[in-house]
Amino acid sequence: MLTFLIPTAKEMTTPKESHPHLLPQDSQAILKIMTAMTTEDLAKSYRIKEEAAKKEQQRWQDMASQQSLAYPAYQLFNGLMYRHIKRDKLTTQEQAYITQQVYITSSFYGIIPANHPIAEHRHDFHTRIKIEGQSLKSYWRPCYNQFAKEHPQVISLLSSEFDDVFSKDCKQLWISPKFMAEKEGQFKTHSTISKKARGAFLTACMENNCQTVDSLKSLVFAGFYYHPDLSTDYEFVYIKKEA
């Protein structure tokens, strides 16, 4: 069985389905630090304006006072990649796929199933805080490595900020898809192409119920197709021709 890892997103939208918010034990130490921060501290840590930091401060306070609602993570996050993932009107098989084989890597919650209920928040590995004298990446590394040991065959759709959260020896069997546009024989990639393609790729995996590495090579989605000459055993390259 394939396991997919996807990142969080800054952009969110409030789904209709909500749950009580239950915070994992490992997240409690982070919440304690975040709730103690002033608006000015948050603005500096997030590198945002104080007006936006006030909103984030209220979210942390609501979590601490157990006033927050929680929503399925893959429906709450609404960044460009998420908007290209099929999330509505899923078949029974597709629903099982996204809830059992897709996990989200979070700097606040750890690694969680895609449908795990989470509260609205802003937090990533660029957030400048120390937990028990450790960076966020060091704090989460044992948890992340344990997940990797339990799921050796991972399809990683993660961005570069996660490269050194996992120890290198835990990623030996990982496959990282790469998405490129071809125009007049020239190949290019950039953030927008990659984010859209990650979502479309995951949707194609769900719809085709991909369970083996070889099945990924036959996927065609959003104009992309597998390019064997540019691919390696650990980096699958998908090309889309541009007019």
Curated annotation (Swiss-Prot):
* A Pfam family reported for this protein in Swiss-Prot or TrEMBL: H2O2_YaaD
Domain of life of the organism in this record? Bacteria
UniProt GO cellular component terms: cytosol
According to its UniProt entry, the protein's GO biological process terms are:
response to hydroperoxide
Q: State the signal peptide span.
A: none
- Can you tell me which family this protein belongs to? Belongs to the UPF0246 family.
Record's protein name: UPF0246 protein M6_Spy1787
What is the scientific name of the source organism?
A: Streptococcus pyogenes serotype M6 (strain ATCC BAA-946 / MGAS10394)
